[in-house]
Amino acid sequence: MERRVVKPPGQDMVVERLKSRYGLAGRCPVEENDMTGVWAALMNQQHELSDFDQTKYKRRIVTSPDGLDTYSSGDKVGSSPRYYSDGRNHPTPPFCSSFKHLNVNCLDDELDSFHDLKKWETEKELMEDDHRDGASKITKQSFKEMETDALMTSMASGLETECCSGSIDSPLKQAVYPRPKVSKKQGLLPHEINQIYDELYHIHMKLQYETTAQKKFAEELQKREQFLAEREQLLFSHETALSKIKGVKEEVLTRFQILKEQHGTEIEHLTEALKEKNKENKRMRSSFDTLRELNDNLRKQLNEVSEENKKMEIQAKRVQARLDNLQRKYEFMTVQRLKGDSHAAHEVKSSKQEKAPAPKPFKAALNGQVYELLTVFMDWISDCHLSKVEPEEPGVDGGKPPAKPSQRSDIQEKCVKLLPMMTEQLQWMPLVSAKLHEPFVRFIYWSLRQLDASARQSTMASTLRRLGEDVFKGVTMKGTQDNSLEHSVENKAKTAVFFKSSSLPLRFLSTLIVLRTVTQADYLAQAFDSLCLDLKTDEGKTLFLEYQAIPVILKHLRISSKGLLSNVIDSLLQMTVESKSLQPFLEACSNSLFFRTCSVLLRTPKLDLHILEKLSIILQKLSKIKSNKKLFEVFTIHLMLQEIQRTTHPEHAFLCINLNSTLFNLGLTKCNSLVTSTSH
């Protein structure tokens, strides 16, 4: 059994095969004198092969793909490729070192050559098995060429195989068999050297291919290293971003927790506020129920009062009927008395013939006690019914609730019927005691005030004008008759004065009646002058408030009465003087009628400066009442005052001071050094 060559660790199969084939596998002890002949023979053969054309073998290597596949797919070369690449550049030293251990035993016998050839074929089969185990096969064409070459050098290859196999199998074999001397004539054939070169060239090509592959692999490694560096940098950036995101996440969670706590706190506050609102709603509901009960009670009381009022009206009608009956009875008794007196009857007839109103004064002279009774009734009616004048806009002054429209209409109808009769009765007043004039005039005044909002006063224009003239001028009567004397009547002129009376209450009432009924400018001017004089006294101010004279005055506070405008303002200005009547007067002016009149007046372009200054004093005092701020805003008086303040020349310091004070009281401007309180 043939011994196989054992490869050292890291050796390539092809290199081992060459070493085992050409005797390079082990060290064979050869003497120096034997190697001298071998070396000389090798040098001669190398010189003879120097001119050998290697192009043929290179072309065969290139055109033989099986051979390239064999060496390219063979085992990896460890340390031997470097050795053979050096041998390619310097071919002489490897051959010398290889053949130091070569034992050439040439036999001339032909049979030994064939025997050795048979061994070489056996060895070739073993080597093919080795190549199959290493995953690289030699093509059939290569083995055929090698077999052809082996036939030419069968002797040399057989000897080399024996020598190498012996040296590899056992080093003791060399000692048993003596080394035969090498014949100087025996040497290596050129074909074997070419085959060695061919093998070395294949190794060289394989090394170059591996070098190129390693360079490419190195470049790929460099690129991959660069790619990994970029990925590492990207990973670092991602890690940094993740750390930032982690910090942001913690901050967001903290902020979310804070917001959650704030939300919970707000919910608690809102819940408490809702509970308070619910409690307040319950209280308001209970208050509303209470108010509703009170309203029901008031409605019941109103119904009761209405029933009582109806009863009082029925009673008043009965009293009026009784009064009429008494008057008829008195007239009947007077007529009976006149029938008993012939002289009186003759005078009555003569008076009828002359169509003179003699019976009236005659009647008046005889009815003094009746007039006293009538004045009592007039005072009672005036105080209980007529003096309760309804405002033109109900509910503005915040006073008592207005009467029913039907009741007010009834009162106005009665006043319309009474005024013509009262105007006729003025002609008797000279025959009546002066103390009865005031109740009579008061009754006329309150009857006129009841007609302020009536639409029928236009139909009574002539009656009102006559009434005003009689009150202004007075009434004079010449013929009188004294009932107490039973002798002839003496003619004596008597006069009843009202407007020019020395009694302040009568004069004040007469002035108001003149202002209410007269349209002549000269009469009105005298009436306002008299009113201003009367208002300088405390009694006059008291009467002004008692008779509610503001609506009468406001009817003349308009631009159409341009000549009387200053007198009207003066009369109102007298009421603004510091006194006990100032505050009631300001409260009486705190209504929509007064503010509407002032608003219309302030809108007048180019209003006289003196009138504006006087009006500003009144408005300044009214602005001190907080409840009047709404009236200032409703009628936009505050805006007009601001515009007047903006356009007023600084030289008019008095007006500027009043305007600034008024606006300051309304909270529309800041206090400055110019604002001072006026005492006018």
From Swiss-Prot:
InterPro entries, alphabetized: CCDC138, CCDC138_C, CCDC138_cc
Keywords: Coiled coil, Phosphoprotein
Modified residues (Phosphoserine): 64, 484
Pfam families: CCDC138_C, CCDC138_cc
Regions annotated as coiled coil: 260-339
Protein name: Coiled-coil domain-containing protein 138
Organism: Mus musculus (Mouse)
Gene name, Swiss-Prot/TrEMBL: Ccdc138
Residues the record lists as Phosphothreonine modifications: 63
Location of the region described as Disordered in the Swiss-Prot/TrEMBL record: 390-410
